[in-house]
């Protein structure tokens, strides 16, 4: 039968995790191509360096993910227990929150590039070429700026990869081993194909349209990640309270904390084996069939923070200072020095003119 060689739950899990990864990676690659691949020798060199950072981040995340997965499998078959499962939600929540913060900062920077494209080209080139000086105050910040295109893909691939390994391992207990390889490969290929389409579309679109669309997409993912991170931390707290994994009880009573629940539906669970694609909504939008106060409030707080942040940035661009801050006034000493310099220049010019006028033969 088809289900003996192709497990649909495994395909959905792998496709969901791959999709979230390729969205971020394809946006980064398309952004680099739009911004830096203009034929200039210096910019082309910077473009190749940053593109290499993206792929190195993907490869490093995949390598660490494979090491962690091998360790988990080894511990499971040696000790007979899943050591990751006991604190899975803590790790997932921390990774989600960290990724949301990084994507938020990068999204704001992406949106400003349309007006500051030339400045960003120079800034990226300088960040790549300038060495990191040990012991300086901004050493870590400079390192993050220099290798930003490595850090985000690394964290994304690591988080999604470990999550996929854990979910696939859980699904395979109810499916034959031969039903796993094919859906894993198909999920990776389909997710990669969607990423390639996003990359090609982003590379050929007008820069400002691409920046707006990609930033909106990144913020949707980041908002979902932020909400999922808070939800995972609350889910771990509930697991500790009941002394087990609440997900194993299904979607009915006992699978959620009724005192901390805003809504709950006994279907549409993103973690169920027959989720019917709800896992994709969970990956992109942060959907949960059992919403908690923390997950809903954090989702709304995230968007309020983003709106306030962009309003503040806009105010700073138009007014020259932040809200509730006094406008910068010109330094009188600087003005006096500049005016005296100008007056000296005028006096010198007049003196030179008099000398020329009084010269013989003038």
UniProtKB/Swiss-Prot annotation:
The keyword Transport applies. Keywords: Cell membrane, Ion transport, Iron, Iron transport, Membrane, Transmembrane, Transmembrane helix, Transport. GO terms for cellular component: high-affinity iron permease complex. InterPro entries: FTR1/Fip1/EfeU (IPR004923). Residues 326-350 are annotated as: Disordered. The chain crosses the membrane at residues 11-31, 56-76, 91-111, 148-168, 179-199, 207-227, 293-313. Induction: Expression is repressed by iron starvation and up-regulated in the absence of the sidN siderophore synthetase. GO terms for molecular function: ferrous iron transmembrane transporter activity. Residues 333-342 have a biased composition (Low complexity). It is found in: Cell membrane. Pfam families: FTR1 (PF03239). It is a multi-pass membrane protein. High affinity iron permease; part of the reductive iron assimilatory system (RIA), a siderophore-independent high affinity iron uptake mechanism. Belongs to the oxidase-dependent Fe transporter (OFeT) (TC 9.A.10.1) family. This is High affinity iron permease ftrA.
């Amino acid at each position: 039968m088809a289900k003996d060689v192709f497990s649909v739950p495994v395909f959905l899990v792998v496709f969901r995790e791959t999709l979230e990864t390729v969205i971020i990676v394809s946006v980064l690659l398309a952004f680099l191509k739009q911004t830096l691949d203009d034929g200039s020798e210096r910019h082309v060199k910077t473009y190749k360096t940053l593109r290499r950072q993206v792929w190195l981040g993907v490869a490093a995340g995949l390598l660490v993910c494979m090491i962690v997965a091998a360790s988990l499998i080894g511990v499971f078959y040696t000790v007979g227990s899943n050591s990751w499962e006991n604190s899975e939600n803590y790790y997932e929540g921390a990774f989600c929150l960290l990724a949301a913060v990084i994507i938020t900062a990068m999204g704001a920077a992406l949106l400003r590039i349309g007006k500051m494209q030339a400045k960003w080209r120079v800034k990226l080139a300088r960040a790549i070429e300038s060495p990191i000086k040990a012991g300086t105050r901004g050493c870590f910040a400079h390192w993050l700026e220099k290798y930003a295109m490595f850090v985000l893909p690394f964290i994304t691939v690591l988080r999604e990869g470990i999550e996929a390994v854990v979910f696939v391992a859980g699904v395979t207990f109810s499916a034959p081993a031969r039903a796993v390889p094919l859906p894993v490969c198909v999920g990776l290929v389909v997710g990669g194909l969607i990423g390639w389409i996003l990359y090609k579309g982003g590379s050929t679109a007008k820069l400002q349209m691409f920046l707006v669309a990609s930033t909106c997409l990144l913020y949707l993912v980041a908002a979902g990640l932020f909400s999922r991170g808070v939800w995972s931390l609350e889910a771990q707290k509930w697991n500790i309270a009941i002394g087990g994994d609440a997900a194993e009880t299904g979607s009915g009573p006992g699978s959620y904390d009724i005192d901390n629940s805003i809504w709950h539906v006994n279907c549409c669970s993103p973690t169920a084996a027959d989720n019917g694609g709800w896992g994709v909504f969970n990956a992109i939008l942060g959907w949960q069939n059992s919403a908690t106060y923390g997950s809903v409030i954090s989702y709304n707080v995230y968007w309020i923070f983003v709106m306030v942040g962009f309003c503040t940035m806009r105010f700073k661009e138009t007014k020259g200072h932040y809200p509730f801050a006094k406008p910068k006034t010109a330094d009188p000493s600087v003005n006096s020095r500049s005016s005296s310099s100008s007056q000296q220049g005028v006096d010198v010019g007049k003196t030179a003119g008099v000398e020329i006028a009084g010269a013989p033969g003038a």
